[in-house]
Curated annotation (Swiss-Prot):
Thioredoxin domain location: 449-579
Protein name, as recorded: Thiol:disulfide interchange protein DsbD
Principal location: membrane
MF terms in GO: electron transfer activity; protein-disulfide reductase [NAD(P)H] activity
Organism: Haemophilus influenzae (strain PittEE)
Job description of the protein: Required to facilitate the formation of correct disulfide bonds in some periplasmic proteins and for the assembly of the periplasmic c-type cytochromes. Acts by transferring electrons from cytoplasmic thioredoxin to the periplasm. This transfer involves a cascade of disulfide bond formation and reduction steps.
SUPFAM superfamilies: Thiol:disulfide interchange protein DsbD, N-terminal domain (DsbD-alpha), Thioredoxin-like
Gene from which this protein is expressed: dsbD
Annotated membrane topology: Multi-pass membrane protein
Length: 579
């Protein structure tokens, strides 16, 4: 009896002990319970408002949240009110995640009820990782939210909302904003990227052997600007669709050298070395239609305007970035094209006025016209110098300008008479030639003045950037940032405004004082390497120059991005606002 009692006791004890083996099996929530997702549409249909309720102990990966309009290639960028947290993930290492909840917006144009938005996200919890979850939302099925989400905490300071973001927002909320881009174009007409187009237009109108009347001069100038605007618009849309690689491709040395050769040939023709004209058979046909060959002249002006658009295309400004940002996020090509066209038209109007004014006041006949024509030949030679300075080492730029200026002043001196006022101009021209030749003398004799050395080394010696090669190195460097802010400068050798930043802005004592409390990082985008492309895609870079700012959580400070040139005072105030 005792043995039987002991047997059953052991059996039940074993069952009791082992019954708990499966009690510890953890149950995980369904994905929709772990990450309860909902979405609404703003009243003006410019924002898709997304919300996630995240169960305690679960988290969503920041870089796994994405959205796009079905059938459109451009992704929609997410702006969240909550800051992501650093998390040591057993699957992906150190990552940024969201916990508890997410309130965010996807900006775009959501007017078509049949359009669909595809939103993808992925999350995990301890011991379990969910596969990517995708929600396909039909625009017409979304409820309209009575309260439009504004990015309350997205911007570190509302004053920091960058100009390109304000312009893009303006286009989202009112299509009438496009006419404001015409006024912005007027202001861009006198930037270093647009001014080189003036000699080309002037050479076409003023540099002709037979000076045109005002109506014809206006027609030539107008067609030139239309050609420029067309190229600028098409290239802008291509950049918005393809991205910075297209912009970089236009700056390939082969393209720059080819355009430079073209301008040199045109300049030599203005010196009378040869005449560029159509084949006789085609020219005779045109003469039959119009003895004055107006169609040929007008067609040439339009073609030269298109070439001028190539010269201006790589230059990024806040208005251009705003228009490109709108096109990339909304997919609205019509509004984007109209915006870019009006921006280019505004850039061209001052060029037209300057040319027409010069056409009216300069002499219209006599031997003086040959001198005028040859003078504009020299002016046209400035374009190859401008283009080649983008691809040659920086030291060559002053040498090329010095060579062109020296030859011009010597030539100009030889054109002057030896009597009276002409003799005085001759002496002054020779003196100026002696001054401008100095960079060539220093190069030939390998000498360098103390002042020149100080100027050349000022920005290089006093501003030290840590060079970043890829996204992994960027993340590591940001994680070790001892300062409250990090600045990432995206730079390219062909970018004119980037060089202006280096020489005029970064070298300013006020700016350098602000730099003392900022981690300075720089990426050279000249070669468009795979690492460069990864950075461009990650930060949705539209053009150069672009400067990004990051907080202590390694997040880009929303609204702080700088595109286009800023002078020292404006940039210093921008940095102060960041702090």
């Amino acid at each position: 009896m005792k043995k039987l009692f002991l047997f059953f006791t052991l059996i039940f004890t074993a069952f009791a002990a082992n019954s708990g083996l499966f009690d510890k099996k953890q149950t995980f929530l369904k994905v929709d319970d772990a990450f309860a997702f909902s979405a609404t549409l703003s009243t003006d249909k410019s924002q898709l408002q997304a919300h996630w309720d995240i169960t305690d102990g679960y988290y969503l990966y920041q870089d796994k949240i994405s959205a796009e309009l079905v059938g459109k290639s451009n992704p929609l960028s997410l702006h969240t009110q909550q800051a992501a947290e650093l998390h040591q993930d057993p699957y992906f290492g150190e990552v940024k995640v969201f916990t508890h909840s997410i309130d965010g917006i996807f900006r775009g144009t959501f007017n078509n009820a049949d359009d669909k938005v595809e939103i993808t996200y992925q999350g995990c919890t301890e011991g379990f990782c969910y596969p990517p979850e995708t929600k396909v939302l039909r625009i017409g099925d979304l409820a309209i939210s009575q309260e439009q989400i504004v990015e309350k905490t997205v911007e570190k300071n509302t004053a920091l909302l960058s100009e390109q973001d304000r312009l893009a927002d303006g286009l989202f909320h009112s299509k009438w904003t496009i006419f404001g881009f015409f006024l912005l174009g007027l202001g861009l007409a006198f930037t270093p990227c647009v001014l080189p187009m003036l000699p080309l237009l002037s050479a076409i109108v003023i540099g002709q052997q037979q000076r045109p009347n005002m109506m014809r001069a206006f027609s030539l100038a107008f067609l030139y600007v239309q050609g420029m605007a067309l190229t600028y618009t098409l290239l802008g849309l291509a950049v918005a669709a393809i991205g910075l690689p297209f912009q970089i491709a236009l700056q390939h040395p082969y393209v720059m050298i080819g355009l430079s050769i073209l301008f040199v040939v045109l300049a030599l023709s203005m010196f009378g070395l040869f005449t560029i004209q159509l084949p006789n058979s085609l020219q005779n046909k045109l003469n039959t239609w119009s003895q004055k060959q107006t169609s040929g002249a007008f067609g040439g002006a339009f073609a030269m305007g298109m070439i001028a658009g190539l010269v201006a295309s790589p230059c990024t400004s806040a208005p251009l970035s705003g228009a490109l940002l709108y096109v990339a996020q909304s997919g609205d090509l019509f509004t984007g094209a109209a915006t870019l066209y009006l921006l280019a038209l505004g850039m061209g109007v001052p060029l037209m006025l300057i040319t027409l004014f010069g056409n009216k006041i300069l002499p219209k006949s006599g031997e003086w016209m040959n001198t005028v024509k040859q003078t504009f030949g020299f002016v046209m030679l400035a374009l190859p110098v401008f283009l080649l300075s983008r691809i040659l080492p920086e030291v060559w730029e002053p040498r090329l300008w010095a060579g062109l200026a020296t030859v011009f002043f010597i030539w100009f001196a030889l054109q002057m008479s030896k009597n009276g006022f002409g003799y005085a101009i001759k002496i002054i021209s020779f003196v100026l030639a002696m001054v401008t030749v100095q960079p060539l003398q220093n190069w030939i004799w390998q000498t360098q003045t103390t002042t020149q050395s100080a100027v050349e080394n000022k920005s290089v010696s006093q501003v030290k950037f840590k060079q970043i090669k890829n996204t992994e190195e960027l993340d590591r460097t940001l994680a070790e940032n001892p300062h409250s802010i990090a600045m990432l400068d995206l730079y390219a050798d062909w970018c004119v405004a980037c060089k202006e930043f280096e020489k005029l802005t970064f070298s300013d004592p006020q700016v350098q004082q602000q730099f003392q409390n900022i981690l300075l990082l720089q990426v050279n985008m000249t070669k468009n390497s795979p690492e460069n492309k990864a950075l461009m895609e990650r930060f949705n870079v539209m053009g150069l120059p672009t400067i990004l700012f990051f907080d202590q959580q390694n997040n880009e400070i929303k609204g702080s991005r700088v595109t286009g040139f800023m002078d020292a005072d404006a940039f210093s105030n921008w940095l102060k606002a960041l702090h």
